[in-house]
Amino acid sequence: MSARAGIVITGTEVLTGRIQDLNGPWLADQLLELGVELAHITICGDRPGDIAAQLKFLADEGVDLIITSGGLGPTADDLTVATVAEFCGRELVLDEALEERIAAILRRLTAGRNLSEENFEAVRTANRKQALIPQGAEILEPVGTAPGVVVPGSPGSPTVVVLPGPPRELQPMWLRAVDTEPVRRAIAGRTVYRQEMIRMFGLAESGLAETLRAAEQAISGFDRLEITTCLRRGELEIVTRYEPAAADAYGQLLDVLRDRHGDAVYSEDGSTVDQQVAALLAGRRIATAESCTAGLLAARLTDQPGASEYMMGGIVAYANTPKAEMLNVDPVLIAEHGAVSEPVAEAMATGAMHHFEADTAVAITGIAGPGGGSTEKPVGTVCFAVRAEGASITRTLLLPGNRSDIRERSTTVAMHLLRRALRGESD
Protein backbone atom coordinates (compact mmCIF):
# COMPACT_ATOMS: atom_id res chain seq x y z
CA MET A 1 0.00 0.00 0.00
CA SER A 2 1.26 3.48 -0.87
CA ALA A 3 2.08 6.01 1.83
CA ARG A 4 -0.94 8.21 2.57
CA ALA A 5 -1.14 11.82 3.67
CA GLY A 6 -3.69 14.36 4.83
CA ILE A 7 -3.62 18.16 4.73
CA VAL A 8 -5.20 20.51 7.28
CA ILE A 9 -5.63 24.11 6.12
CA THR A 10 -6.26 26.34 9.13
CA GLY A 11 -7.57 29.88 9.32
CA THR A 12 -11.01 31.39 9.74
CA GLU A 13 -10.28 33.74 6.82
CA VAL A 14 -9.79 30.70 4.55
CA LEU A 15 -12.76 28.82 6.00
CA THR A 16 -15.08 31.77 5.33
CA GLY A 17 -13.74 32.36 1.82
CA ARG A 18 -12.14 35.76 2.42
CA ILE A 19 -8.82 34.27 1.35
CA GLN A 20 -8.52 31.56 -1.29
CA ASP A 21 -6.58 28.47 -0.28
CA LEU A 22 -3.54 28.12 -2.53
CA ASN A 23 -1.57 25.79 -0.28
CA GLY A 24 -3.81 22.71 -0.50
CA PRO A 25 -3.60 22.36 -4.31
CA TRP A 26 0.14 23.08 -4.31
CA LEU A 27 0.86 20.53 -1.59
CA ALA A 28 -1.37 18.01 -3.38
CA ASP A 29 0.81 18.32 -6.49
CA GLN A 30 3.96 17.95 -4.40
CA LEU A 31 2.66 14.78 -2.76
CA LEU A 32 1.68 13.34 -6.13
CA GLU A 33 5.19 13.92 -7.47
CA LEU A 34 6.54 12.07 -4.43
CA GLY A 35 4.21 9.12 -5.02
CA VAL A 36 2.26 9.78 -1.81
CA GLU A 37 -1.49 9.20 -1.93
CA LEU A 38 -3.47 12.21 -0.70
CA ALA A 39 -6.40 10.95 1.35
CA HIS A 40 -8.02 14.20 2.50
CA ILE A 41 -7.73 17.99 2.49
CA THR A 42 -9.68 19.63 5.30
CA ILE A 43 -10.21 23.30 6.14
CA CYS A 44 -11.03 24.54 9.63
CA GLY A 45 -11.01 27.77 11.60
CA ASP A 46 -8.50 28.89 14.20
CA ARG A 47 -10.13 27.25 17.23
CA PRO A 48 -7.80 24.69 18.83
CA GLY A 49 -10.68 22.25 19.25
CA ASP A 50 -11.45 22.36 15.53
CA ILE A 51 -7.80 21.87 14.59
CA ALA A 52 -7.48 18.98 17.01
CA ALA A 53 -10.62 17.37 15.57
CA GLN A 54 -9.11 17.46 12.06
CA LEU A 55 -5.85 15.95 13.30
CA LYS A 56 -7.74 13.16 15.06
CA PHE A 57 -9.88 12.51 11.99
CA LEU A 58 -6.82 12.10 9.76
CA ALA A 59 -5.02 9.94 12.30
CA ASP A 60 -8.09 7.71 12.58
CA GLU A 61 -8.04 7.42 8.78
CA GLY A 62 -4.61 5.85 9.09
CA VAL A 63 -2.55 8.43 7.21
CA ASP A 64 1.22 8.30 7.57
CA LEU A 65 1.77 12.04 7.24
CA ILE A 66 -0.23 15.12 8.21
CA ILE A 67 0.66 18.57 6.87
CA THR A 68 -0.85 21.67 8.46
CA SER A 69 -0.85 25.17 7.00
CA GLY A 70 -1.35 28.39 8.93
CA GLY A 71 -1.57 29.55 12.52
CA LEU A 72 2.15 30.05 13.20
CA GLY A 73 2.14 33.81 13.77
CA PRO A 74 2.66 35.73 17.01
CA THR A 75 -0.99 36.67 17.63
CA ALA A 76 -3.40 35.14 20.12
CA ASP A 77 -5.29 33.14 17.48
CA ASP A 78 -2.12 31.49 16.11
CA LEU A 79 -2.39 28.21 18.01
CA THR A 80 -1.50 25.48 15.54
CA VAL A 81 1.86 24.56 17.06
CA ALA A 82 0.42 24.30 20.57
CA THR A 83 -2.49 22.21 19.30
CA VAL A 84 -0.19 19.85 17.39
CA ALA A 85 2.07 19.50 20.43
CA GLU A 86 -0.89 18.48 22.59
CA PHE A 87 -2.15 16.11 19.90
CA CYS A 88 1.26 14.44 19.70
CA GLY A 89 1.62 14.28 23.48
CA ARG A 90 4.64 16.55 23.59
CA GLU A 91 5.45 19.56 25.76
CA LEU A 92 6.20 22.96 24.28
CA VAL A 93 9.74 24.13 25.03
CA LEU A 94 11.42 27.45 24.28
CA ASP A 95 14.27 27.02 21.80
CA GLU A 96 16.53 29.88 22.84
CA ALA A 97 18.76 29.68 19.77
CA LEU A 98 15.69 29.87 17.53
CA GLU A 99 14.36 32.80 19.54
CA GLU A 100 17.64 34.64 18.92
CA ARG A 101 17.39 33.96 15.17
CA ILE A 102 13.81 35.26 15.12
CA ALA A 103 14.95 38.38 17.01
CA ALA A 104 17.66 38.95 14.38
CA ILE A 105 15.05 38.69 11.63
CA LEU A 106 12.86 41.19 13.49
CA ARG A 107 15.76 43.63 13.76
CA ARG A 108 16.24 43.51 10.00
CA LEU A 109 12.52 43.96 9.37
CA THR A 110 12.25 46.94 11.72
CA ALA A 111 15.56 48.57 10.81
CA GLY A 112 13.96 51.47 8.96
CA ARG A 113 11.30 52.23 11.57
CA ASN A 114 13.57 53.86 14.18
CA LEU A 115 12.13 51.77 17.00
CA SER A 116 13.46 52.45 20.47
CA GLU A 117 15.06 49.50 22.23
CA GLU A 118 12.08 49.38 24.56
CA ASN A 119 9.62 49.17 21.67
CA PHE A 120 11.76 46.56 19.91
CA GLU A 121 11.77 44.41 23.05
CA ALA A 122 7.97 44.61 23.07
CA VAL A 123 7.91 43.31 19.48
CA ARG A 124 10.42 40.61 20.39
CA THR A 125 8.34 39.50 23.36
CA ALA A 126 5.22 39.29 21.20
CA ASN A 127 7.06 37.03 18.75
CA ARG A 128 8.67 34.83 21.41
CA LYS A 129 5.84 32.31 21.19
CA GLN A 130 7.09 31.44 17.69
CA ALA A 131 10.16 29.87 19.32
CA LEU A 132 8.04 27.47 21.38
CA ILE A 133 8.62 24.07 19.79
CA PRO A 134 7.15 20.61 20.56
CA GLN A 135 9.80 18.65 22.42
CA GLY A 136 11.78 16.44 20.05
CA ALA A 137 10.53 18.20 16.90
CA GLU A 138 12.81 19.23 14.05
CA ILE A 139 12.82 22.95 13.24
CA LEU A 140 12.31 24.24 9.71
CA GLU A 141 14.12 27.56 9.45
CA PRO A 142 11.72 30.46 8.84
CA VAL A 143 11.38 32.35 5.59
CA GLY A 144 9.45 35.09 7.39
CA THR A 145 9.48 35.03 11.19
CA ALA A 146 7.48 31.82 11.63
CA PRO A 147 9.49 28.59 11.78
CA GLY A 148 7.92 25.33 10.78
CA VAL A 149 8.27 22.10 12.70
CA VAL A 150 8.33 18.40 11.94
CA VAL A 151 6.99 16.27 14.78
CA PRO A 152 8.08 12.64 14.32
CA GLY A 153 5.36 10.03 14.49
CA SER A 154 5.40 6.98 16.70
CA PRO A 155 4.22 3.46 15.81
CA GLY A 156 0.57 3.78 14.83
CA SER A 157 0.58 7.60 14.74
CA PRO A 158 1.43 9.98 11.89
CA THR A 159 4.33 12.37 11.47
CA VAL A 160 3.07 15.97 11.50
CA VAL A 161 4.61 18.77 9.43
CA VAL A 162 3.55 22.23 10.60
CA LEU A 163 3.97 24.99 7.99
CA PRO A 164 3.06 28.70 7.83
CA GLY A 165 0.12 30.01 5.83
CA PRO A 166 1.70 32.43 3.30
CA PRO A 167 2.56 30.39 0.17
CA ARG A 168 5.87 32.20 -0.34
CA GLU A 169 6.92 30.91 3.10
CA LEU A 170 5.27 27.50 2.97
CA GLN A 171 6.69 26.33 -0.35
CA PRO A 172 10.43 26.52 0.37
CA MET A 173 9.86 25.19 3.89
CA TRP A 174 8.00 22.15 2.55
CA LEU A 175 10.95 21.34 0.31
CA ARG A 176 13.14 21.37 3.41
CA ALA A 177 10.66 19.23 5.33
CA VAL A 178 10.81 16.51 2.68
CA ASP A 179 14.53 16.12 3.37
CA THR A 180 14.06 15.49 7.09
CA GLU A 181 14.41 11.98 8.45
CA PRO A 182 10.90 11.83 10.01
CA VAL A 183 9.22 12.72 6.70
CA ARG A 184 11.40 10.36 4.67
CA ARG A 185 10.50 7.59 7.11
CA ALA A 186 6.78 8.43 6.97
CA ILE A 187 6.63 8.23 3.17
CA ALA A 188 8.95 5.27 2.77
CA GLY A 189 6.08 3.16 1.44
CA ARG A 190 5.31 5.52 -1.42
CA THR A 191 4.49 4.28 -4.91
CA VAL A 192 5.95 5.96 -7.97
CA TYR A 193 3.23 7.25 -10.28
CA ARG A 194 3.24 8.94 -13.62
CA GLN A 195 0.84 11.77 -14.33
CA GLU A 196 -0.11 13.00 -17.78
CA MET A 197 -2.39 15.84 -18.82
CA ILE A 198 -4.27 16.16 -22.10
CA ARG A 199 -6.00 19.42 -22.98
CA MET A 200 -8.93 19.65 -25.37
CA PHE A 201 -10.98 22.50 -26.80
CA GLY A 202 -14.25 22.40 -28.70
CA LEU A 203 -15.62 19.18 -27.20
CA ALA A 204 -18.54 18.98 -24.78
CA GLU A 205 -18.06 17.15 -21.48
CA SER A 206 -20.80 14.72 -22.49
CA GLY A 207 -18.85 13.78 -25.61
CA LEU A 208 -15.75 13.07 -23.57
CA ALA A 209 -17.75 11.05 -21.05
CA GLU A 210 -19.12 8.86 -23.84
CA THR A 211 -15.62 8.28 -25.21
CA LEU A 212 -14.28 7.31 -21.78
CA ARG A 213 -17.12 4.82 -21.33
CA ALA A 214 -16.22 3.25 -24.66
CA ALA A 215 -12.53 3.21 -23.74
CA GLU A 216 -13.32 1.43 -20.49
CA GLN A 217 -14.83 -1.44 -22.47
CA ALA A 218 -12.13 -1.53 -25.14
CA ILE A 219 -8.88 -1.08 -23.22
CA SER A 220 -7.34 -3.88 -21.20
CA GLY A 221 -6.06 -2.45 -17.93
CA PHE A 222 -8.28 0.64 -18.09
CA ASP A 223 -9.09 0.15 -14.41
CA ARG A 224 -5.43 0.85 -13.59
CA LEU A 225 -5.79 4.41 -14.85
CA GLU A 226 -6.97 7.09 -12.42
CA ILE A 227 -8.66 9.61 -14.70
CA THR A 228 -9.89 13.03 -13.62
CA THR A 229 -11.62 15.44 -15.99
CA CYS A 230 -12.15 19.14 -15.39
CA LEU A 231 -13.80 21.92 -17.40
CA ARG A 232 -11.68 25.05 -17.04
CA ARG A 233 -11.81 28.28 -19.04
CA GLY A 234 -13.96 26.57 -21.63
CA GLU A 235 -11.41 23.78 -22.09
CA LEU A 236 -11.37 20.16 -20.98
CA GLU A 237 -8.43 18.92 -18.92
CA ILE A 238 -7.90 15.18 -18.63
CA VAL A 239 -5.42 14.22 -15.92
CA THR A 240 -4.42 10.55 -15.82
CA ARG A 241 -2.38 9.03 -13.00
CA TYR A 242 -0.97 5.54 -13.32
CA GLU A 243 1.83 3.24 -12.25
CA PRO A 244 4.57 2.67 -14.86
CA ALA A 245 3.29 -0.86 -15.50
CA ALA A 246 0.04 0.64 -16.84
CA ALA A 247 1.79 2.76 -19.48
CA ASP A 248 0.42 0.60 -22.30
CA ALA A 249 -3.15 1.21 -21.16
CA TYR A 250 -2.51 4.96 -21.11
CA GLY A 251 -1.07 4.79 -24.62
CA GLN A 252 -4.24 3.06 -25.81
CA LEU A 253 -6.36 5.75 -24.15
CA LEU A 254 -4.38 8.43 -25.95
CA ASP A 255 -4.95 6.62 -29.27
CA VAL A 256 -8.71 6.50 -28.62
CA LEU A 257 -8.82 10.24 -27.89
CA ARG A 258 -6.80 11.02 -31.01
CA ASP A 259 -8.98 8.82 -33.19
CA ARG A 260 -12.28 10.18 -31.90
CA HIS A 261 -11.40 13.79 -31.14
CA GLY A 262 -8.20 14.58 -32.98
CA ASP A 263 -9.34 18.11 -33.84
CA ALA A 264 -10.15 18.86 -30.20
CA VAL A 265 -6.92 17.52 -28.68
CA TYR A 266 -4.45 20.38 -28.78
CA SER A 267 -2.02 19.42 -26.01
CA GLU A 268 -0.69 16.00 -24.99
CA ASP A 269 2.09 17.29 -22.74
CA GLY A 270 0.04 19.57 -20.50
CA SER A 271 1.15 22.77 -22.21
CA THR A 272 -1.53 25.47 -22.27
CA VAL A 273 -2.82 27.27 -25.32
CA ASP A 274 -1.23 30.44 -23.92
CA GLN A 275 2.18 28.76 -23.83
CA GLN A 276 1.75 27.34 -27.33
CA VAL A 277 0.69 30.72 -28.74
CA ALA A 278 3.68 32.39 -27.09
CA ALA A 279 6.01 29.90 -28.79
CA LEU A 280 4.29 30.35 -32.16
CA LEU A 281 4.58 34.15 -31.90
CA ALA A 282 8.38 34.00 -31.88
CA GLY A 283 9.63 36.38 -34.57
CA ARG A 284 6.19 37.97 -35.05
CA ARG A 285 4.57 41.26 -34.05
CA ILE A 286 1.02 41.03 -32.71
CA ALA A 287 -1.62 43.65 -31.87
CA THR A 288 -5.10 43.36 -30.37
CA ALA A 289 -8.37 45.25 -30.78
CA GLU A 290 -10.97 44.56 -28.12
CA SER A 291 -14.44 45.72 -27.28
CA CYS A 292 -16.39 43.48 -24.87
CA THR A 293 -13.25 41.89 -23.37
CA ALA A 294 -11.79 45.33 -22.59
CA GLY A 295 -8.11 44.33 -22.66
CA LEU A 296 -8.40 40.83 -21.17
CA LEU A 297 -6.90 39.26 -24.30
CA ALA A 298 -3.94 41.65 -24.28
CA ALA A 299 -3.42 40.88 -20.60
CA ARG A 300 -3.48 37.16 -21.28
CA LEU A 301 -0.95 37.47 -24.09
CA THR A 302 1.40 39.50 -21.93
CA ASP A 303 1.13 37.10 -18.99
CA GLN A 304 3.69 34.90 -20.74
CA PRO A 305 7.41 35.48 -20.12
CA GLY A 306 9.08 37.18 -23.08
CA ALA A 307 5.86 38.79 -24.32
CA SER A 308 7.70 42.06 -24.99
CA GLU A 309 9.42 40.31 -27.90
CA TYR A 310 6.18 40.00 -29.86
CA MET A 311 3.42 42.09 -28.24
CA MET A 312 3.22 45.51 -29.88
CA GLY A 313 0.12 46.82 -28.14
CA GLY A 314 -3.63 46.75 -27.94
CA ILE A 315 -6.60 49.08 -28.27
CA VAL A 316 -9.78 48.85 -26.21
CA ALA A 317 -12.41 50.43 -28.43
CA TYR A 318 -15.52 49.92 -26.35
CA ALA A 319 -17.69 52.54 -28.04
CA ASN A 320 -18.21 53.08 -31.75
CA THR A 321 -16.37 56.40 -31.94
CA PRO A 322 -12.95 55.01 -30.92
CA LYS A 323 -13.52 52.09 -33.28
CA ALA A 324 -13.69 54.64 -36.08
CA GLU A 325 -11.07 57.08 -34.82
CA MET A 326 -8.43 54.69 -33.48
CA LEU A 327 -8.97 51.58 -35.60
CA ASN A 328 -10.21 53.27 -38.77
CA VAL A 329 -13.43 51.24 -38.84
CA ASP A 330 -15.79 52.82 -41.37
CA PRO A 331 -18.89 54.17 -39.53
CA VAL A 332 -20.96 53.03 -42.52
CA LEU A 333 -19.86 49.46 -41.78
CA ILE A 334 -21.06 49.79 -38.20
CA ALA A 335 -24.34 51.34 -39.33
CA GLU A 336 -25.00 48.55 -41.85
CA HIS A 337 -23.90 45.52 -39.83
CA GLY A 338 -23.78 46.66 -36.21
CA ALA A 339 -20.77 46.95 -33.90
CA VAL A 340 -21.07 43.23 -33.11
CA SER A 341 -20.56 41.73 -36.55
CA GLU A 342 -17.92 39.88 -38.51
CA PRO A 343 -17.23 42.78 -40.92
CA VAL A 344 -16.56 45.11 -37.98
CA ALA A 345 -14.36 42.51 -36.24
CA GLU A 346 -12.35 42.12 -39.45
CA ALA A 347 -11.98 45.88 -39.78
CA MET A 348 -10.88 46.15 -36.15
CA ALA A 349 -8.18 43.51 -36.70
CA THR A 350 -6.96 45.26 -39.83
CA GLY A 351 -6.96 48.61 -38.03
CA ALA A 352 -4.94 47.24 -35.10
CA MET A 353 -2.44 45.67 -37.47
CA HIS A 354 -1.90 48.99 -39.27
CA HIS A 355 -1.88 51.10 -36.12
CA PHE A 356 0.88 49.06 -34.48
CA GLU A 357 2.67 48.04 -37.70
CA ALA A 358 2.11 44.43 -36.71
CA ASP A 359 1.99 41.31 -38.88
CA THR A 360 -0.62 39.56 -36.72
CA ALA A 361 -3.80 40.87 -35.11
CA VAL A 362 -6.80 39.62 -33.15
CA ALA A 363 -10.10 41.46 -32.71
CA ILE A 364 -13.04 40.71 -30.41
CA THR A 365 -16.41 42.45 -30.37
CA GLY A 366 -19.47 41.09 -28.60
CA ILE A 367 -22.36 41.42 -26.18
CA ALA A 368 -21.33 40.30 -22.69
CA GLY A 369 -24.58 41.35 -21.03
CA PRO A 370 -26.54 41.39 -18.93
CA GLY A 371 -28.23 43.92 -21.22
CA GLY A 372 -27.70 44.91 -24.84
CA GLY A 373 -28.90 41.72 -26.49
CA SER A 374 -31.63 41.31 -29.08
CA THR A 375 -33.51 38.48 -30.76
CA GLU A 376 -31.08 38.59 -33.66
CA LYS A 377 -27.99 39.07 -31.48
CA PRO A 378 -28.64 37.74 -27.96
CA VAL A 379 -26.34 38.20 -25.00
CA GLY A 380 -23.30 35.99 -25.53
CA THR A 381 -22.94 36.79 -29.24
CA VAL A 382 -19.24 37.40 -29.89
CA CYS A 383 -17.43 37.98 -33.18
CA PHE A 384 -13.74 37.19 -33.65
CA ALA A 385 -11.26 38.03 -36.38
CA VAL A 386 -7.65 36.87 -36.64
CA ARG A 387 -5.24 38.13 -39.24
CA ALA A 388 -1.80 36.61 -39.70
CA GLU A 389 0.59 36.18 -42.58
CA GLY A 390 -1.03 33.64 -44.89
CA ALA A 391 -4.03 33.02 -42.64
CA SER A 392 -7.36 34.65 -41.89
CA ILE A 393 -10.05 33.34 -39.53
CA THR A 394 -13.40 34.94 -38.70
CA ARG A 395 -15.99 33.46 -36.35
CA THR A 396 -19.26 34.32 -34.63
CA LEU A 397 -20.19 32.28 -31.57
CA LEU A 398 -22.93 32.30 -28.96
CA LEU A 399 -21.16 31.81 -25.63
CA PRO A 400 -22.94 30.73 -22.43
CA GLY A 401 -22.70 32.12 -18.92
CA ASN A 402 -22.83 35.45 -17.16
CA ARG A 403 -20.93 38.58 -18.11
CA SER A 404 -17.68 37.43 -16.53
CA ASP A 405 -17.99 33.94 -18.09
CA ILE A 406 -18.60 35.34 -21.56
CA ARG A 407 -15.63 37.69 -21.38
CA GLU A 408 -13.28 34.96 -20.14
CA ARG A 409 -14.53 32.39 -22.66
CA SER A 410 -14.08 34.98 -25.41
CA THR A 411 -10.38 35.28 -24.64
CA THR A 412 -10.05 31.47 -24.68
CA VAL A 413 -11.75 31.24 -28.08
CA ALA A 414 -9.54 34.03 -29.39
CA MET A 415 -6.39 32.26 -28.19
CA HIS A 416 -7.40 29.05 -29.95
CA LEU A 417 -8.27 30.84 -33.18
CA LEU A 418 -4.93 32.64 -32.98
CA ARG A 419 -3.15 29.33 -32.44
CA ARG A 420 -4.79 27.90 -35.54
CA ALA A 421 -3.89 30.92 -37.64
CA LEU A 422 -0.27 30.85 -36.50
CA ARG A 423 -0.14 27.19 -37.53
CA GLY A 424 -1.21 28.21 -41.02
CA GLU A 425 -4.88 27.22 -40.80
CA SER A 426 -7.42 29.54 -42.38
CA ASP A 427 -11.10 29.80 -43.26
Curated annotation (Swiss-Prot):
Pfam families: CinA, MoCF_biosynth. It comes from the Bacteria. InterPro entries: CinA, CinA-like_C, CinA_C, Competence-induced_CinA, MoaB/Mog-like_dom_sf, MoaB/Mog_dom. Gene3D superfamilies: CinA-like, MoaB/Mog-like domain. Belongs to the CinA family. PANTHER family: NICOTINAMIDE-NUCLEOTIDE AMIDOHYDROLASE PNCC, NMN AMIDOHYDROLASE-LIKE PROTEIN YFAY. This is CinA-like protein. It comes from Mycolicibacterium smegmatis (strain ATCC 700084 / mc(2)155) (Mycobacterium smegmatis). The lineage of its organism: Bacteria, Bacillati, Actinomycetota, Actinomycetes, Mycobacteriales. The gene is cinA.
